[in-house]
Design a protein with these regions (language model features):
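Catalytic cores of nucleic-acid ligases and guanylyltransferases
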Residues: 1-232
């Protein structure tokens, strides 16, 4: 998805031709399930199944789904920092899993029961997902769409309270097929307005997969009233 250029992209876009979803603050995953079991893959193609055994053992079916892996339980997401605890464990214990549960928000489907749905429109693919999630599929949950009539209303939703665990909204053309990469004009990400804070870098950690050679994950700290440096 391309970052949204408000003056350019919204001016030419009809709200009726798009759907909106929350941009969840987790990691993007593909869920590949078939007769031999289930596997999870990151956006870089790295398999992360062993880090989330409690998820893959409960998923059954014949499909490839696209979604967001989040920390939390019962469809109630926590922060990305909470998820980071799980990402650092390649073989988590049962005790650790219970203390740091995770689930998946699903927002698209590529294959279902042997059918390749990538050339279908987004609306057609959503119908397949709505049917599949008409029954409980925990620890997977359908990522809900946001009802909106105009861009001004969606703008307010996008920048809603910091208590909401999302980075903004995704805007997707209802007629769009599932296309790899970042095709312009079909999917847009509209992030929240940035917030400013004076902080101190406390820790730096290497990323995962292709980002493992870079220090891409940082923990910042601020001073509390007792003048103690605490992580945020």
């Amino acid at each position: 998805a391309h970052p949204l250029v408000i003056e350019k992209d919204l001016a030419a876009a009809n709200p009726k031709e798009f759907v909106a979803e929350y941009k969840w603050d987790g990691i993007r995953v593909q869920i590949v399930s078939h007769s031999e079991g289930c596997r999870l893959y990151s956006r870089t193609g790295d398999e992360v199944s062993k880090s989330f055994p409690e998820i893959i053992k409960t998923i059954q079916g014949n499909f490839v789904l696209d979604g967001e892996l989040l920390a939390g339980i019962n469809n109630d997401p926590k922060t990305f920092n909470d998820l980071q605890q799980r990402l650092n464990k390649k073989a988590p214990s049962e005790k650790f899993i219970k203390k740091n549960p995770c689930f998946i928000k699903v927002y698209d489907v590529l294959f279902f029961n042997g059918d390749d749905l990538r050339d279908k429109t987004l609306i057609e693919r959503k119908k397949v997902l709505n049917s599949y999630f008409s029954t409980n599929r925990s620890p997977m949950f359908l990522s809900e769409t946001i009802e909106f009539k105009d861009w001004r209303f969606l703008d307010k939703i996008r920048d809603i309270s910091n208590k909401q665990i999302h980075e903004g909204v995704m805007i997707k053309s209802v007629s769009s097929p599932y296309i790899a990469g970042r095709p312009r004009g079909k999917w847009f990400k509209w992030k929240r307005n940035p917030k400013n804070v004076d902080a101190i870098i406390m820790y730096a950690q290497r990323g995962h997969g292709k980002r493992s050679s870079f220090y891409s994950d940082y923990t910042f700290g601020v001073f509390n009233k007792e003048k103690e440096l605490v992580p945020i």
